[in-house]
Amino acid sequence: MSEPITFTAYAVKNLCYIAGRKMPAGSPAGIIIHSTGASNPNLRRYVNAPEICGENPYKNYFDRPDIDICPHGVVGLDKDGAVRAAKLLPWTMCCWGCGSGAKGSYNYSPAYIQIEICEDDLTDEAYFKAAFKLTAQLCARLMKNYPTIKLNNIISHKEACARGYASNHGDCDHWLAKFGKNMDWFRELVKNGGEEVVRYKVTGTKTVTRADLGKAQAQLIALGFDVDAEVL
């Protein structure tokens, strides 16, 4: 049995949890990745699990009845400074996460699993990589557990808005761009189970006669090389 990626900290006081609306048939249809938009990477800000996350004296986490938002999961730092993922709702319960767009809402039909990543000040590359790696691992696990989720439907809030099924937000693309990444990079990360693919540029030269030039070019093109030739 695979080890759990998340710890459970259900937001039982949140009205979304209390409503308990089940996802429709064919859902979860995808996953939306959000980021919080505030410089606070600590899970205790959003998750009521003091034994894991630490105490939040303000109690302004998602586990309260006076808030109209609740994602399925939150990724951030626990009380020991480790990147962890908290599960706030059952995966097959509709969350209140992305709002609505011109065509409807991915909160409901079709329903998407939605995960918040706690932002820091967007300058710590080590935290960025660790947080998105764990989120990618979680997405890969969810795809395995729910075959209705396809890779092209793992999207950001910004992408959900562009499709017409979410409110006008820019997360988490702005954070990805800080480190030269985008959602295509994240989807590839999910595809590879959270491991970033390292690519190498291979170049070389080979001298051939005019008679063999066409054959040599064809062989290199078949291997995926960009081919150029010059007279020596």
What residue ranges belong to the model's regions?
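N-terminal catalytic cores of peptidoglycan-degrading enzymes
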Residues: M1-Y108
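Basic/polar, cationic surfaces and motifs that engage anionic cell-wall
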Residues: S2-K13, A19-A25, A29, P110-I113, ...
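Short glycine-centered, acidic/aromatic-flanked micro-motifs in structured strand/loop junctions
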Residues: S35, N42, I117-E119, G204
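General small-molecule cofactor/ligand-binding pocket signal
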Residues: L89, I155, D228-E230
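Short glycine-rich, low-complexity/disordered patches
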Residues: E195-V197, D226-L232
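A short beta-strand micro-motif
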Residues: V198-G204
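A short, charged, amphipathic alpha-helix used as a generic interaction element across diverse proteins
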Residues: T209-V227
